[in-house]
Amino acid sequence: PICMKKWLFLILLFPLTCVAQTYRYLGVEDGLSNRRVYCIQKDKTGYMWFLTHEGIDRYNGKDFKRYKLMDGDVEVNSLLNLNWLYIDQEGVLWEIGKKGKVFRYDQIHDCFNLVYKLPMESFSEQPDPITYAWLDENKHIWLCNKDTIFLYNTETQQVTHIKNDISEEITDIEQIDESHFFIGTEMGIHYAKLENNTLELINCDKLESLKAQIIDLYFDKKIRKLFIGTFLRGIMIYDMNTKSVIRPEQNLKDISITQFRPLNDKELLIATDGGGVHKINVDTYQITPEIVADYNSNNGMNGNSINDIFVDDEERVWLANYPIGITIQNNRYTGYKWIKHSIGNKQSL
């Protein structure tokens, strides 16, 4: 009995750990084609799709499959062709690059087909004529150039040319309703109406006065608020109900905001380049750290440069986390809990 008590005492001196993992990492050693991931999507089958520096990867929860993008016999794999990945309302995957090449995923043949490419002879002096590409709710892909917006209809494959009267480099777009849009640029933000193949700018003093390089926009249709992410100027909110601009007190001014993603009805996740992930309450505008690198922890977050963020149905947060690759945070688990005997405290282990 004395020996047994001695061993029991020694065991209780050692830390006990709860083995539930909060974070999981997917890197090149697991099959990811490149550590630099630009976009994350999830299809209706449940596959995760990653647009990387090398091409497109599909992940089934265990294995990766890499897809090549082909223009005839030539593989399209330069940085100018790997820029945006979208899923439309029918669940079809689209990839678009700054050269204006549009690829559509063919589920039957399990490959990406080139369905449109911008006539590059018109842009001989511009190696990357498209500053931003975007898929709207009206089945159009917007290929935004400083002078022209090319609208590619995903159903008819027809392309409409629209004059870009903003005359600034478009960086992001959010749709308000059938014909109204918020358009972010290198210089600021605009309110516009697209009708009869004409983009009409609508004067909005409060928005026009915001002078900042816009990186990401998120419009919450329920509460009619636009969340504005900038380069080194923090976050701003435009409230359409009160026609006012709000600048939260605790702001992220020294880092670049890369992405907003809804976490729930009341909170948005904010991905940053250098500051990890924060969250903002959509009513109070309080900003708090959510997923930030902890290099001293065995199972903590291990990077703060986040290109994209995706929240799935199981509340897992998928992060494009350079230079790691993909980091998955599972909110349903906590990190390691260290339990150890406190010497002199009879109530402790």
Positions of PLM-derived features:
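Carboxylate-rich, polar loop motifs that coordinate divalent cations or form catalytic acidic clusters
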Residues: 1-349
